[in-house]
Amino acid sequence: KAGQLNLLADPFRWMPTAVNPLDGTGDPARVTAMIREGKVGSLFNGIGAEAGRRIQQVAMEESRLKIPLLFAADVIHGLSTIFPVPLAEAAAFDTQLAYRTARAAAVETAASAVHQTYAPMVDVARDQRWGRNVEGAGEDVLLNNLLAAARVRGFQGDKGLDDRDAVLATAKHMAAYSAA
């Protein structure tokens, strides 16, 4: 059961030699075997709808516990359709815009067999040299709060996570990451 806590960077999607964090190689057969053995609970960066169905079938039909896998990705400012980065979007001071772009990204993400996004990024920018400032809404605490809430609603949909077009939003980097 503890294996279900393992999140692996997906070695199936981006390139055949993608890095497997367990052994430094891209080894889809090994990852598939680990899924069968119940040693993997989620894959990061998605694998596409067709491959997702196939690998989910392995988890559900060939593993002992039959627990479905969770597919996750960083959907910071879109998936197939790319929107302005959150920092640029924040310049509009428009929560409806943040909601609509997150909703559109969620529809594409869910259609790609991804269940969870590591977004929105909610760090308050404290140092303009920090390279990840573009993932958040800047230095204003209130604006960060309002836009993050709008993005969570957009990702998770009006009907909640039961909606087939919803993805689980995971706010990240909350503990002074940009101030470190």
Task: State where each predicted segment sits.
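Glycoside hydrolase catalytic-domain context in secreted enzymes
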Residues: 1-180
